[in-house]
């Protein structure tokens, strides 16, 4: 345990994991990873020097989580380091942060940010089927399937407006410049999602490799 949300003395903030407990020191590495040291942190793995070097920098333990500490001292976890990637320009991208922001749009059911080693991040998007079909109907366009809906120019323009709106929360290097709408829903049964509804990133990347390449063509 390195931090606690405590109801006493207003030491509680929704969306964070609380304030760092006494005796523990937390710092944020250059790539955004949360590092900590204190009496609750191990010295290393028993007789596993190489394994220890992977997770320890001096007295600091690498948590594997990406996060930030706000002005009031509350610690917030925003992503997992293993899901972060670097663009060809050397900028680190935390995809989950961008995805969570974009999913505030009623148009978006699922989204996966890609772009490792590329000049910019881009996104694969699974639209909210019921919402977009109803939206198109109100716009005078009749569609009965997602596959048909994603080809409609009006819908693509609406998604561009949504992306542009939510891009304002990010730096220029993090903004989604290109996106593709997938013609089917992402489901557990089809292998897109885990039983807890998390993205199976490799599966999705492999399945839509053609769409990804088209965004960087």
What residue ranges belong to the model's regions?
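Adenylate-forming
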Residues: 1-6
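Conserved ANL (AMP-binding/adenylate-forming) active-site segment centered on the GW(Y/F)…HTG consensus within
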Residues: 10-17, 41-64, 98-99, 140-150
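Conserved C-terminal "lid"/linker of ANL adenylate-forming enzymes
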Residues: 85, 110-112, 135, 160-217
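C-terminal boundary motif of the adenylate-forming
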Residues: 66, 71, 105-131
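Alpha-helical "lid/cap" subdomains adjacent to substrate-binding clefts that gate access
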Residues: 127-166, 183
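Conserved ATP-binding/catalytic segment of the ANL
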Residues: 20-87
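Short Gly/Ser/Thr- and Asp/Glu-enriched loop/turn motifs at secondary-structure junctions
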Residues: 80, 116-120, 174-176
